[in-house]
Structure formats: C-alpha cells, structure tokens
Amino acid sequence: MAPVKISHVVSFSSQDPKYPVENLLNPDSPRRPWLGCPQDKSGQLKVELQLERAVPTGYIDVGNCGCAFLQIDVGHSSWPLDRPFITLLPATTLMSLTDSKQGKNRSGVRMFKDVDFLAPASGELWDRLRLTCSRPFTRHQSFGLAFLRVCSSLDSLDDSVVGPSALLSSVLNKIREFKTCFFSWSLKKMELEFSPLLLSINLNDLQFAADAEVSTVSNCMFISIALQSAMIIF
C-alpha cells in the first residue's frame, strides 16, 4: 500500500491557533494535534482535505485527541460546491461514552480499512476527504485529531489507474478495428455475390464513413450499426 500525501487544507470549521489544522498535513512530523478553538462549544469539527491525486483508499490511520465520533466522506475536487459527498466511513466511535464524559483515554490510534468502508465509495478513486469529528457529551474541553495517514490500495502511486478517458480511448480503438475488419469482409462478400451492383455504389463514401473520427462511443456504435444496415439492404 502506497502512502498518499495530503496536499492542502480546503476548508475547516474551527481551529486553535496553537494547534492549527495544518498539523494534519504531515503525519510523520513531531506530532502536534489539530484542536478546535477553545471558544467553540458546538461539539463538532469539520475539515476538508485535498489529496495529491485521486486514488482508491486502502486504509486510513487516525490518531485521536478527545474526539468521540468520526465520520469520513469522500468526493472529487472537480465537483460543484453544492454536490454532497459520499460516505466512506460512517460515524464511528473513537471513545466510550464514559471516557468521553470524564475526559479519560483521549488518545488512541485506529486503523480503518476496506472492511470498514461502505460499498458505494470503497474501491473508487477520490481526491477529497471530509472529516466530521464530534463530541456531544461534554463541550468544555477542546478536541480534535492527533494525526491522519492515508494509504492507497495501489502498491505504488506510479501504478497506472485506468480512468474514464483511458477507457473511452480503448473502446474507440476497438470499434475502429472492428469497422476496418467489417469493411474488408463486407466488400469481399459484395464482390463475390453482388459484383454487378458494385458498379453503382460509391465505395469511397463508405470508406470515408468508416475512417471518420468520432468523439464518443455512442457515435461509434451508431455509425457501425448504420453501416451494417446498409450492407443488408444492398
């Protein structure tokens, strides 16, 4: 599993100037936590983080600092601001009710992996994380996270990831190969069975249609079906 760098903080709800949210950007530095502002009594903290690239999430290490519950949602930096994120890790307990009320055992480390993630988001490529930390039982103490470490399910970040554009290009190439073979076979068949009719057919027009550049898979499929129909008519 390859570690994924958190490139920057997109937004946050609250921070203590002495323990800012930027402390989460480097989990391997001498650890200083991210804590909410001492005057913030809402009992909830939120932060949105940008990853260096979109990757499938293998596991997430979380160092706790007084947070009772944690939820992790994922999304894409290209999404509009009003589009809701998808839940990767549902609200999960980091402290017991008793410890949270008494302020005991505030520190701890949890590893969340594939079996903890929800199916709609697990295994997909994401480059945004949105963390929601909450401590509803007592609000007189600051809380937050000690560190956050994200790892991809890829063995290396140099591994190729097939995205939509690469997949589309592959499909288009396959369709073009099919059309070339189809025309070669069809013209030979027509030459054997309908040689008198070939005199009245403009083969250049047909070949032009076969070689025409297309931009979407749907257009390719439409042209292929139309050309096959033309062969049946002839």
UniProtKB/Swiss-Prot annotation:
GO terms for molecular function: damaged DNA binding. This is Protein XNDC1N. One of its GO terms (cellular component) is nucleolus. One of its GO terms (biological process) is single strand break repair. It comes from the Eukaryota. It comes from Homo sapiens.
